[in-house]
Amino acid sequence: MFIKLIQLIFLFVCFQLNAFAELKINTWETKEGAKVLFVENHDLPILDVNVNFFAGSAQDPIGKEGLANLTHHLMNLGAGGINEEKLANQFSDIGAAIGGDVDLDRAYFKLRTLSSAPQRDKALTLFKYVIHAPDFPAPVIDREKDRIIARIKQSLTQPETIANLAFMKSIYGDHPYGRNEAGNIDTLQKLNQADLKQFYKNYYSSFESSIVIVGDVSADEAKKISESISQGLPQGNTKHNIASVTAQNYVGVKKIQHPAKQAHILMGMPAL
């Protein structure tokens, strides 16, 4: 039985390696400077599109921590003149799904849709509303700020969050990587619609974006899709950077008292 299991695992690994070996990735750049990666695959009638931006929380201006996270969050809550409820329903009606996330370095949006032309075209139109024409409605901004602030307050009572924030601060000091990605209560309260619009304009440009297209479309169709995405994004040729990380000299043990019954231990050291 054990030998048969090993044989099955070996065959599976060989199959996977062979699949990766045959994977053909086409690359090009759009006229606006977006980098595109495309994998054609007709096994399933599915199309996946992922658009990445150099718009992570490390780009938050001092005094406006939480701006990157809030901007990304609001882009999907009303766009192209369509409110958040109708937008979600229209994606759902055609069996499409939109998602995304933001981290220290980057923000991204992803779309999964059926590849048949009617569903695909409708899904891409809605997707482009989100990344091309976010509305940033002021009442929704205020509502979501309150929700995020409530989550921050709750998280600051949890030992895991307290430990993670202290650990990152010990590693990165005053570098943007040492800050809370969600921001803090004081800075979030001050953010407004103009801040979000300006951050979107500065950091969601086609010049610093990358587009990944995988699935049941031809190369010509993928090029048309990538161009239509790239053309509608803010234009510009500004290349944003993140300050180099300076190694901290802190060595030792930091203990934080907490009434929780469990202990959280985080350890780290300089590495590549």
Task: Map each language-model feature to its residues.
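Short acidic/His-enriched helical or mixed secondary-structure segments at domain edges of catalytic enzymes
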Residues: R147-L165, N249-Q262
